[in-house]
């Protein structure tokens, strides 16, 4: 047992060292190129506003997404005044996502070993998984998918162990992982549903005929689903208290569903605007990033059925549940269909490849045949990597990634930093510049004087927007309406970006390489 413990720590240490250097190094390079994940930066902004705005409060989140990624960066953001890059380049998010990426790979290695792989082979397969673009890029860019993957694999590992060991303590860990997953990303609700159904069926099967069969499988379901219920209820209550809506993501114009509906024309350009086209598009994405995942999953399920091993259902419930909801959301028009949303197919397929390899390792029959088959499977996990990296450069399949590159080339963040520097140079008092941080959050993050802004999360934002002069607001900062269709300032003063709407005069303008203009208007005093 001691030897196994030392071996496990050593192998985990190799994964930790390799992935930490890889993800942090890639993160530094991406930040240096101004290739910033917009969702990652907005989550850092939520955490930043909770600490450094003129009205700091933990409910500064927009309540449109899970709060955990924003809360996780707050300890790092406390050092932002001394290390501005933590906020200005959202590098605090990169540190957190890199940590989560490292944790995810450690958990993936342990799952591969649990599925029967040897230590060295598990290291190799984990290394292949770690350099996959859908794993590496979120971990190096601050994207929340890295945190979601870590907690999903944590739940998967413990669910797989429970399916094999029937230890109720494992279900406590499963429930904890799923509850955390919901607080990262609401799509985790599908994993919760699939897991609870799986636990219900398996627990009932195990306890059938017993005197306390009913109470036992209900207890197991409570352990697996209870933390999610608590997280769901508490977050809904917090949303109600802060925004007046139980589910702000569905009610707000800034929610993903509303934004996806608004951008449907752009999505229809690549799908043809029909179900067949959408299915073809999703299939192309899936085949590009995980072309053999379906094959590995199918083979593993056949082997598991033959061996009567329910362990493979753990990844199917958690990873497969999240993936299924992502696909359904896109087909229903509630999602942008970003390439990164295919993420869960990658580890699911890799884990099932590991299961096949583990079966070959422990199997019977000619050793030469089993070794040859194992090499074929191992090579099959490696060969698709170049195709997956190519997919991230395809403007049709990887629309979000290409937008990030175009933004960097256009100098958008450099232009926004110029806006922040100019406002800082004015030495304005608190609350002098009103802006909708749904769109201007990079400017606030780049500023060394964040309290000069009146921002959307401020509890007196609406009051100051209704009467800027009385509220001692001197300027309004707005951008192109085509890129800010739900801007609160433009809604209050229609036409302000074009001509000041009769209430303000143009003070200054900044234009980036794509022609996107930021305009600073000074409110006219009576």
What are these regions (language model features)?
Residues 16-17, 119-120, 196-197, 225-229, ...:
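Signature aromatic-anchored transmembrane alpha helix within multi-pass, membrane-resident enzymes
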Residues 37, 62-65, 134-147:
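Short acidic/glycine- and proline-prone juxtamembrane loop motifs at membrane-interface regions
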Residues 45-46, 50, 61-85:
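Short hydrophobic/aromatic helix or loop-helix immediately within or flanking a transmembrane segment
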Residues 52-58, 217-218, 236, 240-304:
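Membrane-lumen/periplasm interface segments of multi-pass, membrane-embedded glycan/lipid transferases
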Residues 109, 200, 206, 280-313, ...:
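Hydrophobic, aromatic-rich transmembrane alpha-helices
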Residues 114-116, 155-173, 181, 205:
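Membrane-interface transmembrane helices that cradle and orient dolichyl/undecaprenyl
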Residues 138-139, 145, 190, 291, ...:
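Hydrophobic/aromatic-rich transmembrane helices and adjacent perimembrane loops
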Residues 379-439:
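Membrane-embedded, lumen/periplasm-facing catalytic core of multi-pass transferases
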